[in-house]
Amino acid sequence: MSASLVNRSLKNIRNELEFLKESNVISGDIFELINSKLPEKWDGNQRSPQNADTEEYVEALYDFEAQQDGDLSLKTGDKIQVLEKISPDWYRGKSNNKIGIFPANYVKPAFTRSASPKSAEAASSSTVSRPSVPPPSYEPAASQYPSQQVSAPYAPPAGYMQAPPPQQQQAPLPYPPPFTNYYQQPQQQYAPPSQQAPVEAQPQQSSGASSAFKSFGSKLGNAAIFGAGSAIGSDIVNSIF
């Protein structure tokens, strides 16, 4: 990070502390305590005492190709010494005897160890202002194992006829007892009466018989009329005499 930006932030913090002191938000003792902890001026090449005693290492999770001068290319599994955390998204570190900037979301914390005495490496850092790089998206690797083939059902050879399985004969159900009225009386079927064809009378015989009866009746009628008339007439004659 640029030294000018850090020194500007320190100046802003002191101004804010003075404003809080004048507003009676903090006391003079607190102001002096906080102000004494702040450095007067920050140099970009100096490191904090904690960083001088320990070295922080991170491990690369993804491959990263340098996009411009000053970037540090990474390979998955590389161990990188963190020299400076420029921002939450970008770190400056050393790996494979190279120093550069790499995205913070491409690494994970690995370990820390005590720093060995060695000469300070001069590496000027410029102001970095660029967007964060999202981790690469990997497609799922193809399975190394061959897919299991579904075996086809067994087909008998040609000309071979498999006998059907024997059918199980079901035992007959027991007949219910007679008192349950389960057995119904068979309905009697009546045959319709046969129609007899009417007997046709012989026209000649009937006509002859009817004519005979008519002639016989007319004779009887004439005889009766004649007999009655003669009897009445005799009575009248007798009454006159």
Swiss-Prot record:
Start and end residues of each stretch annotated as Disordered: 118-213
Post-translational modification as stated in the protein's UniProt record: Ubiquitinated by RSP5.
Coiled-coil spans in chain: none
Main localization, broad class: cytoplasm
Location of N-acetylserine modifications: S2
Motif (PY motif): 135-138
An annotated GO cellular component: cytoplasm
Biased composition (Low complexity): 118-131, 180-213
Stored Pfam families: SH3_1
InterPro entries assigned to the protein according to its UniProt record, in alphabetical order: SH3-like_dom_sf, SH3_domain, STAM
PTM sites of type Phosphoserine: S48, S114, S116
Domain of life: Eukaryota
Subcellular localization, as worded in the UniProt entry: Cytoplasm; Nucleus; Cytoplasm, Cytoskeleton, Actin patch
Role this protein plays: Involved in resistance to EDTA.
Domain observations: The PY motif is recognized directly by the WW domains of RSP5.
PANTHER family registered for this protein in UniProt: JAK PATHWAY SIGNAL TRANSDUCTION ADAPTOR MOLECULE, LAS SEVENTEEN-BINDING PROTEIN 1
Protein family (similarity comment): Belongs to the LSB1 family.
Protein name: LAS seventeen-binding protein 1
Gene of this entry: LSB1
